[in-house]
Amino acid sequence: MGIQGLLPQLKSIMAPIGVEALKGQTVAVDTYSWLHKGALSCGDRLCKGLPTTRHIEYCMHRVNMLRHHGVKPILVFDGGHLPMKGDQETKRERSRKENLERAKEHESAGNSRAAFECYQKAVDITPRIAFELIQVLKQEKVDYIVAPYEADAQMTFLSVNKLVDAVITEDSDLIPFGCSRIIFKMDKFGQGVEFHITRLQRCRELDLNGFTMQMLLEMCILSGCDYLPSLPGMGVKRAHALIQKLKGHEKVIKHLRYSAVSVPPQYEENFRKAIWAFQFQRVYDPVTEDIVHLSGIPHGSSEDLDFLGPWLPQTVAKGIAQGNIDPITKEPFEGKTESSALAFDKVHLNRESSAPSNGKKKLDLPVQRNVLTNYFCLASLEAKRKFRAPKVTPKQQVLNGSLPSPRIEDSGTPDLIEDTSLPSNNIQVYQCSSEHFSSGTPLDDSINTASQCSSERVRCDIPRDDSASVSPQCSHDIGSDPAEDPDIEGNKVKVNFCNRSTIPTGSFLEGTLPGISDPFLDSHNTEPSRAAPRYAEKSNVVSANRNITVRSSYFKTVNKRVCTNQGEDECHDEDNCETGNYTLPGDQQRSSGGILKRRKFSDPQNFEDGMFQPTSPHESPPVADKGCDSDSHDGINTNSEGKFGCNVAHVNKYSGIAEKSMDKFAALISSFRYAGSRASGLRAPLKDVKNTLPVRSVLRPPEQRFGCTAKKTTRVPLQSRFSSDATNSTDVPDLSTFAYRPTTASAHSDQGKITSKATDAAAGPPDLRTFAYAPTRSTTSRFDQSENTRKAMCTADSPPDISTFEYKPMKSAVRRSDGSKFSGAALKAARRTSRS
């Protein structure tokens, strides 16, 4: 656990360091901190007792990293339990049990992630786990030592006695122990931070000037450590302030008791024992091979020192230090464990062979036993059937005198095939890999061919005569040799098509290869072979110098494929691979002039002579669907003067069908001619009764018809501005009657005139100026007031004057005898306002 909150307070004096800086030095390593980190990846297996080596591999990776950079590591293991940490060990054991129970509950509930996290907290690194790592260290010749009790005290002993140059750990307890050089937080790349005890005076977070090692130790114990828990509310900063002020733990404890802080009765005694545990703990001395104290015990102390660790015999202490005796049970370990052996095989640098952790042997299969090779190398039953050489007539020998020998072409680089003697009575069609084979062979009764390639092009050009003798030229792909089958079926040719791809004809019809002898030429043909002409385009024509055009037959039942025969026999649906059987009848009639008629699927006896006559689009006969959509065109013939690719007469039939379809579509669309109807034509448009125009006008109506013009009213001569000008309107209410006007004195003689004028204004439209607030004037006004009134009334047709809405002070209705001069001044000011 260490000192809680101490390392963050010393951050300013921590310096980054790399493993390269430790080259040639010896470092002590807190191995249990590495084991705890490595156990995070296999906590569930360690808790269940299942064999695993991940934690060992974690430690050995870092050991090899140190050795790779020239650093000599000494791994230090924890030993037995220290009596001073009894309470702390009890708490940790209780926490591990609780986490183990939670992990089992989560695992039974199916929450594997939460269970794994609880397993990580429940892992207990036991001496048995450490023993497995020790066995690997022995085989790797890495130095190690098992402390009799605490590894922190053992590493401090090695550091103080200059047996090591630095200590690698994650525990801050080494600072109060007095270790001079510590490396914290070292990762797998060898990067960490370095603490040096000489930098304590430069700490910025805590003022440690004047602090001795005893004061630093007491400050750490007061803030809380593994040997003594801290008091409530006591942390590193408060402990630092108290120690800095009072200089000793006795005065601090006395000060806390007088400060109403709850201090347990045994706290001071336990504090003293904690100091002794940090200073005088029992450790193993590798020089004397015996147990010694971390530092010399002062003379005169006669108390029991078993709280520093019980005394052990030298043989037991040595056996524990060497890893042969369990430091807790004090019994020897059993023999070499399986996990340590497996771990050694994994981390050994010069191992010849490594065994996997699960113990399974590596599956080593020959090439032919793999699934991939089985898929490509096994031949089907059709490919294993042998072929019988057909009989050849002299007429066919003349026709096939120019057939070429087979040739191999692979990506533009010809490779010669080994010399193979093919029998004259058997022809084997090979399985395809990446080579192409072309052979000319006459047929009498039947040919049984099979192709197992994933992409092939089967092309057969067969001239026929009255005797039903056939001489095909087929280009196939070559693979492995299939076995022969004695069973032969007559009068049928079976071909398997799988994603066929077109192969240029000209590239395979030139030259001969000495490696393969043509069975037909060897046994029957006496004329020398002549090279066939090279074709620039893909075609089903075998020879251009003869007036014979032969197309290969088609499947009888072909589903889900659309095939065309204009220049090449390719299927548009190349994604589907189907196999079909078709029959070449032995008796096929041949018309005069070298015209070969194509057989129809639905009726093999239905043939037409002559060229296909184009018909009108509307008289196209219905197309019968017998399994192939576009292959079975009735009556499509070829003559000796042209090629089959030039015959496009069947286009007229489909153009007629398309024209009929377009006529129907146009007739359907023509019914929706009304503007406003939907473009989709889902429903008829709604009839507009009011609008009878065929085309709706898009012009905007004249805005003059809707223009707003001002209505002129009859002027009333010389009306007061307190009344409205309109007198002719009787329908529109006069809003001016609702205007607020202050009442004037009843003594004025002109009050009746004002009232009568306001009444006459009810007949006209409302004047906004009547809503202006204006004070009433006395009856004894000057003569020039009428001029202002006349000017104001002349502007009735113009927009209202905003100045009329100004606030004007009212004049008193009853004139005072001494206020004449003030009345005159007020009238002049009112006159100026009205003029403006």
UniProtKB/Swiss-Prot annotation:
It is an enzyme of class 3 (hydrolase). It comes from the Eukaryota. It holds the Pfam family XPG_I. Residues 84-108 have a biased composition (Basic and acidic residues). Residues 578-592, 744-758 have a biased composition (Polar residues). One of its GO terms (molecular function) is SUMO binding. Keywords: DNA damage, DNA excision, DNA repair, DNA-binding, Endonuclease, Excision nuclease, Exonuclease, Hydrolase, Magnesium, Metal-binding, Nuclease, Nucleus. Residues 568-577 have a biased composition (Acidic residues). Mg(2+) 2 binds at D171, D173, D226. Its cofactor is Mg(2+). Residues 1-99 are annotated as: N-domain. Its EC number is 3.1.-.-. Residues 82-108, 464-488, 568-641, 744-836 are annotated as: Disordered. One of its GO terms (biological process) is DNA repair. Residues 138-230 are annotated as: I-domain. Mg(2+) 1 binds at D30, D78, E150, D152. One of its GO terms (cellular component) is nucleus. Binds 2 magnesium ions per subunit. They probably participate in the reaction catalyzed by the enzyme. May bind an additional third magnesium ion after substrate binding. SMART domains: HhH2 (SM00279), XPGI (SM00484), XPGN (SM00485). Belongs to the XPG/RAD2 endonuclease family. EXO1 subfamily. Putative 5'->3' double-stranded DNA exonuclease which may also contain a cryptic 3'->5' double-stranded DNA exonuclease activity. May be involved in DNA mismatch repair (MMR). This is Exonuclease 1. It comes from Oryza sativa subsp. japonica. The gene is EXO1.
